[in-house]
A protein has these predicted regions:
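Non-catalytic, soluble scaffold/interaction modules
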Residues: 1-124
């Protein structure tokens, strides 16, 4: 029977180091996070960094070739981020919900676009 006062079940070991989203574009890569709020901040993104943002639109497209992977809070398999990442062969995890809260510039992560997960390897 449901007990509203029962303690929440313990999370699996390491669960706090995994961010789940939707598979946007297949591929696995490890790299350093660059959290960006606007394409106007795009000059901060260094080649090979993991682009983390809330969502993307056509204004973000010039940044994608520099990114090793893309992670967004909002979106699905037909979102701008997913489509552009697939076209360029860049792994993407979209629709994570809280990636921009949990990830900071300098964090080291592993992005698995095929499984839709981001593993936090080392926090900055």
């Amino acid at each position: 029977a449901y007990d509203p006062h029962a303690p929440a079940p313990a999370a699996a070991p390491g669960a706090e180091r995994v961010i789940k989203g939707h598979p946007g574009s297949a591929g696995r890569v490890e790299g350093v996070v660059r959290r960006i709020d606007s394409p106007d901040e795009g000059e901060q993104l260094q080649p090979g960094e993991i682009l983390v943002t809330s969502t993307t639109n056509v204004g973000w497209t010039p940044l994608f070739p520099r990114a090793a992977a893309v992670v967004t809070d909002i979106g699905g398999s037909l979102s701008h981020a997913a489509i552009v990442a697939r076209e360029l062969g860049i792994p993407a995890v979209v629709g994570c919900g809280d990636a921009t809260i949990r990830l900071k510039t300098g964090d080291r992560v592993r992005v698995d676009g095929g499984r839709g997960i981001v593993e936090i390897l080392e926090q900055a």
